[in-house]
Amino acid sequence: KRQEPKPFDFAKPEKFRAFFKEQLVLVGLEKYTYEEGETLCADVQIANYGKTDCAGDLEWTLWAYMPNEELDSVRKVAVKSGHMSVVSCPKGTLSKAGTLKIELNNKITSSVRCDLTVKIADAVNSYPIWIYKNEMPKCPESVYETTKLDLQAKKVLDNGGIVYYSPKSEESSFHNSIRAQFSTDFWSVGTFGRQEGAMGQLIQKDHPLFKEFPTESHTNWQWWPMANQRAVILPDTVKQPFDAIITEMDSYAFLRPMAQLFECRVGNGKLLYSTLGLQDLQQYPEGKALLRS
């Protein structure tokens, strides 16, 4: 029987052809996350393994996914564009087309997910990037931030306050935990038993916490520093299913309920519990942006 197309967005034929083709534009990005005021610099190459030479101007566009709060939707807006003159990309070669330099200092007023699209003739490619506001995180006065559940945390909770609990993301801080992973395990824990079994994150993308940290329900490159931190194994006394803000998915061999970020009521107050160790990830634009958000 002939195989039927898979009913998923990632399996659409046009998405596969976008990277698996004879001619393709390649952008050598140093990273995927930036802060406003930075300059995106990247070498551009043309991979031409088709039957004909490729020639023409190379065009690029930076598209931003801007929130439309009135319609509760997102619109894709071109915020920057330009072109580079390319004389020729001979067949059978990988040719350097030039260097992109894009100033990320205007027309973007909030933290946004963007797509950088590059095109020459019929060859098109697109790369996701994230641009964050260049602001230092500041804990609101109404929130008690702590790395220990100390007497002050108990007092705040007893009085109906909010506690943000964020220890160092290491095994000594979370005894009943595993190291989380950005990707799934290799093959299976049954075949390679030294793996801890983490299978990536499931994210409540519409949670208010992510208003200034655009995300999908799964991890993308902006999650790399956070996704590889600890994930706590929830005790049996926690009613399942538990609706964590960030759930760490477990291997089929264990099926342990795990989380990296969740909120709950403790006594009269509210507790935001994090295993991400964001205070130690402030060298990353994405780490700073998530803590600020």
Regions found by a protein language model. Give the residues of each.
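Hydrophobic beta-strand core residues of beta-sandwich domains
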Residues: 34, 88-94, 108, 157
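Short beta-strand elements
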Residues: 83-88, 122-140
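Short amphipathic C-terminal alpha-helix that caps PH/PH-like domains
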Residues: 287-293
